[in-house]
Amino acid sequence: MMRIGLLGFGTVGKGVYELTSARTDMQVVRVLCRRELQLQDAEVTHDFNDILNDTTIDTVVESIGGLHPAFEYVKAAIEAGKNIVTANKALVATYYDELLPLAQKMGVHFRCTASVGGGIGWLSELERVRRIEHIDYVGGIMNGTCNYILDAMARMDLSYEEALGRAQALGYAEADPSTDVDGIDTWHKLIVSSNVAFGVSLDISGIPAAGIRNITKKDMDTFKKHGLLCKLISTGKCTDGVYSAYVQPTLVELGAPEAAVPMNYNLITLKGDVSGRQSFFGQGAGRYPTAYNVVQDCMDFLNGRGFYCSYGEKVAVNNEEKRAYYVRGAVDAWLQANADETWGEAIVTKPVSVQDMHNWLKEHPNAFIAALPEKTL
């Protein structure tokens, strides 16, 4: 029987405990929790060392979130020879280059299926696909909070502030929504997805992210006039050994699959050179969808399955591919030189490199950009 040390007893941790309690092949035996807690089948501790030094615990499930002390706990557990399951996309994306080689060196298993797509099982599917074919694209709608806000603005004719307020009232958005609306959550998920899909370790310093914070109702009205909707889209590509990766608001045609994704749902897509386009739809968060894939990872350990791919070489990101952009909120000489037409108060650019557009946005943080549609994958 697998003996589990559970770090954290919040939304995900409680779900993991409930799902494993009904099983005979695994058991949560110790739980790290800051608050006072009584559990029938597990010992509750405030000291991580109680889990670390328990030699009967073979697997640690990290569900405390954030970078610290999650990183220190996970690293110590790996060094102690314990398998790791985590749903913490920030942890995996930020410390991929340290934790993955360490796990392989120590001969322990490491999986994080729930870190991208919640209950969708996206990373496990990437693992299966790449056994047979080359994956040249991953991406799509990876953040339910942003999708809810954009969907509410489009369907209910709300302002950004009104849509955000509804998302917060429903529990889809935090009191401080920055990680979601600034694209950071999607950025983390794209990094993990791209590394698994392409079997490399992308240089994350070269991956830009633009969010939806500055979008307005007037922007949405303009998009509607042109038969378009706005979605926050992640893009990772591998073309002839050249890697690109970025997160940005993107305009999609009404008939595109992404346009039909409602509320807080995700739609994540891969494109392989044999099977073509495959898309995966579902809720990207929640207690049971997320806990479900944590337990699936534990079951994979029982069947001898470790990480989704071997740790790959460090590679640079090249975002020189060209896209046309809708830009509103700032104007300078570079933008005027690359203007193609105007949509109301906004400029639509000629095709410019993704990197140049994001560099421009860094200098004009109050502006809003959205890439125009590109050819269907």
Walk through the language-model features, giving the residues of each.
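NAD(P)-binding Rossmann-fold cofactor-contacting core
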Residues: 22-40
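A conserved regulatory-domain signal marking ACT and ACT-like small-molecule sensing domains
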Residues: 298-300, 304-377
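Conserved anion/nucleotide-ligand pocket segment
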Residues: 128-193
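Glycine-rich adenosine-cofactor-binding loop
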Residues: 3-18
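Rossmann-fold NAD(P)-binding glycine/threonine-rich loop
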Residues: 71-74, 89-127
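ATP-dependent carboxylate/acyl-activation modules
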Residues: 257-322
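Substrate-binding/catalytic subdomain of NAD(P)-dependent oxidoreductase enzymes
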Residues: 164-260, 265-267, 286
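ADP-ribose/adenylate-binding Rossmann-like module
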Residues: 65-66, 77-95
